């Protein structure tokens, strides 16, 4: 799965194929020099639910510095949850029978894309 972001609008495109769209650059996970313990998603799957916490140490959530969204990619597609500054960096995703997690991503507004 490839994730692209528009450099001006910050719009995101998710694609299973490589894209060449003007104004969009591919986001590469875990390439920013920042505290991994606050950015790398941690997840567990139980009873058809994937529970995701961003960071082994909770990521701060303020208007200036927050996790904007969390995404899981699976053998059947992907799901995204958007977070807000007044919430916590934790989300849950329901999985279908036979659906397997392939990747878990978190996007920090200051430090970019992170993958478990």
What are these regions (language model features)?
Residues 54-62:
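Short amphipathic, basic-aromatic surface patches that mediate peripheral association
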Residues 109-116:
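Short acidic/polar inter-strand loop motif in beta-rich domains
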Residues 2-7:
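A short beta-strand micro-motif
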Residues 76-86:
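Solvent-exposed serine/threonine-rich low-complexity stretches and specific carbohydrate-binding patches
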Residues 66-76:
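Extended low-complexity, serine/threonine- and proline-enriched intrinsically disordered segments
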Residues 95-100:
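Surface-exposed, short loops/turns at beta-strand junctions within beta-sandwich domains
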Residues 13-49:
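Transition segment at domain starts
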Residues 89-93:
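Short strand-edge motifs at loop-to-beta-strand transitions and within beta-strands
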């Amino acid at each position: 799965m490839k994730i692209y972001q528009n450099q001006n609008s910050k719009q995101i495109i998710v694609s299973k194929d490589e894209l060449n769209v003007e104004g969009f650059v591919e986001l590469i996970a875990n390439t920013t020099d920042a505290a991994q313990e606050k950015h790398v998603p941690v997840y567990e799957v139980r009873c058809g639910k994937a529970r995701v916490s961003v960071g082994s140490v909770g990521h701060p959530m303020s208007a200036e510095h927050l996790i904007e969204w969390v995404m899981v990619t699976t053998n059947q597609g992907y799901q995204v949850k958007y977070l807000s500054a007044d919430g916590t960096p934790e989300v849950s995703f329901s999985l279908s029978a036979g659906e397997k997690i392939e990747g878990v991503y978190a996007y920090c507004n200051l430090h970019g894309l992170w993958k478990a």
